[in-house]
Amino acid sequence: MKYIFNRYNALLLRRPLITNMITTGLLVGGGDALAQFFFPNNDNNNLEQQPFDYLRNLRAIIYGSLIFAPIGDKWYKFLNTKVVWTRNAQKPQYQRSMSTLLRVMVDQLVFAPFIGIPLYYSSMTILENRQPFLDNIIDKFNTSWWITLKSNWLVWPLFQFFNFYLLPVQFRLLAVNIISIGWNTYLSYVMHSQK
């Protein structure tokens, strides 16, 4: 296990974006696969067992690797360098705690509601070719945005506090991706439960 971690760390240092793109794609795809396995009959209340949808899973992998990972990579670097508590700089522990709290607030009050959740639903709507795109995106927001955001606030703030406080910036997206296996299962379930 230590070898795998050391190898992954070396890849993160040498090629951070590519490493994050591959990791995120695989873990978002894993979340979709779990959603299909655990909630196979959620599509339009169909009671028949549905076969595994490989194209749906491929779309999830594409979203994770090509859309979310580059944005997430930049987002965590932005939070780490630009969202910093500057008052009481003579007390480093206080400054670190307040910077962490501020990062969680920005992440949960800006990124989640206005970037992360809309990006997922609009990207998946387009990747699934649900035309007319704009009408279907608006419908998905109307039916799922608020419930997803409330669920997000149950899962992410506490985790993100520890993520931002304890982990170096290069490992934050990986930590989010690991927790996101469950979160992506939920997102995939919500995305495909109300077409």
UniProtKB/Swiss-Prot annotation:
Q: Where in the cell is it found?
A: Mitochondrion inner membrane
Q: Which GO terms describe its cellular component?
A: cytoplasm; mitochondrial inner membrane; mitochondrion
Q: Is RNA-binding given among the entry's keywords?
A: no
- Chain ranges passing through the membrane: 17-39, 59-78, 99-121, 168-190
Q: Which UniProt keywords apply?
A: Membrane, Mitochondrion, Mitochondrion inner membrane, Transmembrane, Transmembrane helix
| Pfam families recorded | Mpv17_PMP22
> How does the record say this protein sits in the membrane?
Multi-pass membrane protein
Give the main location.
mitochondrion
User: What is stated as this protein's family in its record?
Assistant: Belongs to the peroxisomal membrane protein PXMP2/4 family.
Q: What does this protein do?
A: May be involved in cellular response to stress. Required to maintain mitochondrial DNA (mtDNA) integrity and stability.
- Annotated protein name in UniProt: Protein SYM1
Give the source lineage, highest ranks first: Eukaryota, Fungi, Dikarya, Ascomycota, Saccharomycotina
